[in-house]
Amino acid sequence: MTHDLATQLDSLHDVNVLVVGDVMLDRYVYGRTDRTSPEAPVPILNVEQQEVFPGGAAAVAAFARQLGATVSLVSVTGNDSDSRTLRRICDEAGVDTSAWHTEERRPTTRKERFIGQASGRHGQ
């Protein structure tokens, strides 16, 4: 069975894939939470690091490309910095974004995750 899976994955080098769907920019923001806001009982995050990744259909396209397929991505984003960042990431991954449409009146979808480590606690 493992041999069959390896053979199938190797065969992706000969496959053309068209991905159509909603793309988004996934942003992870990491930091420390050393204090709580005086206005509300919420922690204040001191940002130490940020990472961005393709999300949604862009993630599917990037994964297919990593497996060796030739990938074209069709989607719509806004005309903003998140769109440019997402397109750059996809282009660098080898995904064809020539059918990507930019719409002036809409924002690019961005999903942000804020991950804080409390002071005095061990990381997991």
Label each PLM-derived region with a short phrase.
Residues G21, G56-A57, G123:
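Glycine-centered small-residue hotspots that permit tight backbone geometry or close packing
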Residues G21, S75-G78, G116:
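Short beta-strand/turn micro-motifs composed of small residues
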Residues D26, D80, R121:
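Flexible, glycine-rich phosphate/dinucleotide-binding loops
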Residues Y30-E39, G116-A118:
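Short, flexible, mixed-charge acidic loops at enzyme active sites
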Residues T102-R106, K111-Q124:
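Conserved phosphate-binding/catalytic loop of the ribokinase/pfkB sugar-kinase fold
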